Regions:
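N-terminal accessory segments
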Residues: 1-38, 66-69
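Short capping/connector residues at structural and topological boundaries
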Residues: 28, 38, 85-86, 90, ...
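N-terminal glycine-rich flavin-associated loop
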Residues: 14, 40-71, 95-135
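Glycine-rich loop at the start of a catalytic domain that most often binds anionic cofactors/ligands
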Residues: 36-42, 63, 83-93
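Short glycine/serine/threonine-rich phosphate/pyrophosphate-binding segments
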Residues: 57, 80-81
Length: 135
């Protein structure tokens, strides 16, 4: 796929949607967002956006699709396979702020949570309900 070059209009859209405090661009983006725990693979996104709701994620993804802007999704950056590294630039969609537990269904032994929840927090949460999560 051929991607469009990220520009100031794209940055404005993101900042209007999420606010300037949750959108950083280009050289403002810290090095931690240019790699994951794999090491060796580095790339800088054009924008880093910290989404806080599924509505924001949906609007960002729709805009990116309509404008041919690549999106790399990131949780907490602890991955070991390079999947959270923005190799094509574009938008780094940070979901670490979406860190709520939504539902524990003890009958079916399922847990519904947002993508920013850390595994160590899953363990603590289920222990409070006399359950065990083997990571």
């Amino acid at each position: 796929m051929s991607y469009k070059k990220f520009d100031d209009a794209d940055l404005k859209f993101l900042r209007d949607l999420c606010g300037t405090e949750r959108v950083t661009a280009r050289d403002e983006i810290g090095e931690d967002y240019c790699h994951d725990e794999l090491g060796g693979t580095r790339a800088r996104p054009d924008a880093h956006v910290k989404a806080l709701s599924t509505d924001e994620v949906s609007k960002i993804m729709k805009y990116a699709f309509e404008n041919a802007i690549p999106v790399t999704v990131r949780g907490s950056g602890t991955g070991l396979v390079g999947g959270a590294v923005p190799l094509e630039g574009g938008i780094l969609l940070d979901l670490s702020g979406m860190n709520n537990f939504l539902e524990l269904d003890e009958k079916n032994m399922t847990l519904t949570l947002e993508p920013g929840v850390l595994l160590m927090d899953v363990g603590k949460y289920v222990e409070e309900h006399n359950l065990f999560y083997p990571p």
